[in-house]
Amino acid sequence: MKKKEVVYQVFTRLFGNTNTTNKPWGTIEENGVGKFVDFSTEALSEIKDLGVTHIWYTGVPHHAVINDYADYGISNDDPDVVKGRAGSPYAVKDYYNVNPDLATDPSKRLEEFKELIQRTHNAGMKVIIDIVPNHVARNYEGITNPEGVEDFGASDDTSKEYDVNNNFYYIPGEAFKVPEWKDGYLPLGGDNNRLADSKFEEVPAKWTGNGSRLAQPHFNDWYETVKINYGVRPDGAKDFEELPEEYRNKDYKAHFEFWKDKTLPDSWRKFKDITQYWLDFGVDGFRFDMAEMVPVEFWSYLNSNIKMKNPDAFLLAEVYNPDLYRDYIHQGKMDYLYDKVELYDSIKHIMKGYGWTDHIPVVQKGMADIEHHMLHFLENHDEQRIASPDFAGNAQLGKPAMVVSATISTSPTMIYFGQEVGEPGAEDAGFGKPTRTSIFDYIGVPHHQRWVNNKKFDGGQLSEEEKELRDFYKRLLNFTIKSEALMGQYQEIHFYNKDHTEGYDHRVLSYVRWNDNEKLIVISNFDAHKAYSFGLKVPEEVISKWQLKDGKYPLTEALYGELKTNMSISNGQGQVQVELEPLQSYIFKVEN
C-alpha cells in the first residue's frame, strides 16, 4: 500500500557550512560554504531517521555565482546581473553541470554530485533537483554540453522579437541596460569587482525572466534572468497544438503519444533533453520553478516524456493560482503542486493569532478532488521562517500547525532544513534580508549549525528546547510515513463540535482519518496561551462508517504513546474527554 511521502528541502550550499562569521555580502572565504561531501553517510542517516523519503537538493544546477573559476574554463559572472554574491539558484547558467562552489574539486563536480546521489540512495531516500523552465541566467553558457546539444539562443534569429524556434524573445535595435539601483543598493554591497561597472553587454536586449519587455528592466524585475520562448507569441497566441479537452482524463502514456508526431518549438526539446540527462544521471524527480509562467501543453509534453523513462519520478511544481491547479495536474501531468495560497496562507494567518480554524476544513473541502496532489508545507526557501518575528516569532507555534499540515490529507509533506530546530533566519546576509534564510549569499544557519555540531550531525550543541522540537518533528513525520489511515478517508468533525460541544473553540481544530485497518482522531489547539477542556464528540455518521457499536473503546495517543484514554459510544455517538494545553495536539488511535 502506498504511504505518505516526506520531502526534506535543503539549501545545498548552506547545509554543511560551519562558519559563523555571517558578514553581510561576505565572500566564500569569509563566510564559508557547504559542499556535497558534507552530506555524509551519518548526515543522511539522520535525515532519513527524521522520517524523510525524498531530499530536494536546492541550488544544484550551475547558476551564476561571483567566484573565479576561470582555471576550470568557467567564465566569470557579472555582479550587475547576479543577485547576491553566491548567486540565485534560479538563474541557471549551465544545465548540464552543477554549481562549482559545492565541490571540493570543481573539476570533478559532476562526479561529486553523482556520489552524493549514490549516498542518498544508499540511505534509502530519493533525490529531487530544481529545473527552471521559465528563465535562465542572462549569461547562459554550457561548457560541458553532451554531443549534439547546443546552448539556448545559439541558433536564434536575433533580428526578430519572436520566432517560434528562437529560445529567447528580443528587443531588436536596443542594447540591454542594467537597472537603476534603488534604496542604496549596490552590487556586492559596493565591494570592488572589475565587472561591477553598471554595464552588461547584451545586444539586442532580451526579455527579462518575469516577462518585462524593457531593454532596461526595473530593479524589482528578475533582471538577472531572461525569459524562455515556448512558442507563445508576444500577443499570447500559441504556435503549437493545444491539448484536446478529453486529455484531462488520459494518462501520461496517452499524452506522450499525442506529442510524438507534432512539430514543436525548439525550447520544448531542449528542456526535455535536460530532464532526460538528469534522469539518466540518477536523479529521481524535479521541482519546477514558477511552472504557471510556462504553457500547460509544454508540461504535458515534458512530464509525459519524464514518466515514460521513470514512471515513479516525483514531479513537484510551484503554482500559485488556484484557478490553474487542475489544469497543471490533469493536463500538465504534475504529481504535486504547492498548497500555498489555500492551506499554507490559512494556517499562517491562524498561527499569527488572527482568524479561526474554521477556514481549514473549508479549504480541504474545496480541494477534495485534488487533495492528494497538493503538497503541504510551513516553510520553504521563499517563505519566512516560522520562528522569525514577522511570522510566528516562536517555533513552538509551528507544532499544532505541523500536525494539521502533515495529517489532514494524503498529500506529501515538506519541511525546510533548520525548521525542525526552530531556525529563525535572522541574518542580514547581503542581498538576502532577515526572516528568510538567504538564497543569494554565503551565510551560516545558526540553529541548524548547532545540530550539525562540527559535522557530527548529532545535535550536540542544541538547547533542550531545540532538541525537544526536533524530537517532535521526528515523531510526527515518522508516524505519517507509516500510517495507513493517512492515505485513507478524511472527515472534519470541527463544525459539529463547535455547534454541540461546550468548551470547544474556534482556535481548536478536529477531524478524523481512517481506513479499514486504522482509525485516528486528530485534535489541535492553535492557541498559545489558553488550555481547553471538553468532551469531543465523534458524530454518528463517523461511528457508523467505522462500524463501531455502543461501548468503550481504548484510545492511544500516537506520537508519544503515553496518554491512554477511552472513547465512549452511546446511542451511536462517540465522546472523548480532552484536556488540551496551549499549542498541544493529540493524534488518538482507536484500539479495536
Where in the sequence are the language-model features?
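Short, well-ordered coil/turn segments that N-cap beta-strands
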Residues: 4, 51-53, 123-125, 282-284, ...
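Substrate-binding cleft/loops of secretory-pathway carbohydrate-active enzymes
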Residues: 137-147, 296-308, 319-350, 424-432
